[in-house]
Amino acid sequence: ELFNSIKIDSSLKHLSTMLDTNGSAESSTWNKILPVTDGVMVDLKAFDDKVHQKLTGTSNVQVLQSIQYLHEVDKLFEVRLLIIPGWNDQESMLQKTAEWLSQQSTNISIKILGFRQHGVRSEYSHLQQATPEVLEKVSRTFHDFGFKRIQLV
């Protein structure tokens, strides 16, 4: 409703409407909100489904389908990768992730976020923080697959 209100109010039409999501919505849900959405930023916790399930409690199948669908309808603004050392920073996993995303498009904006312990729930406080060196390694992998729009956070 908020995005719809922004789009129909002439004094607010200049505002962009961007959605930050875990990507779990199905295409029927996307179809309801995309007409009033300028772009979508999707979090992909892990390309490997087993790792994704361990981290989030859910499969990544719908997340990957959402990324594909949003790209097809030209609403995918950015894919955000949360890098957690020992969980999803292995070179083989990074290459599989970069390869799959490059099959969608290398014009996708990639935001590489290093895991930080600040503000996380207690069950995740034992996870290791990502160092700048780890994030640089991830960036190089995506660069090697042709991605140009890579941001490290």
Q: What kind of region is each of these model predictions?
A:
Residues 125-141:
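A structural motif corresponding to the C-terminal lobe/cap of the Radical SAM core domain
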Residues 68, 102, 136-143:
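Class I S-adenosyl-L-methionine
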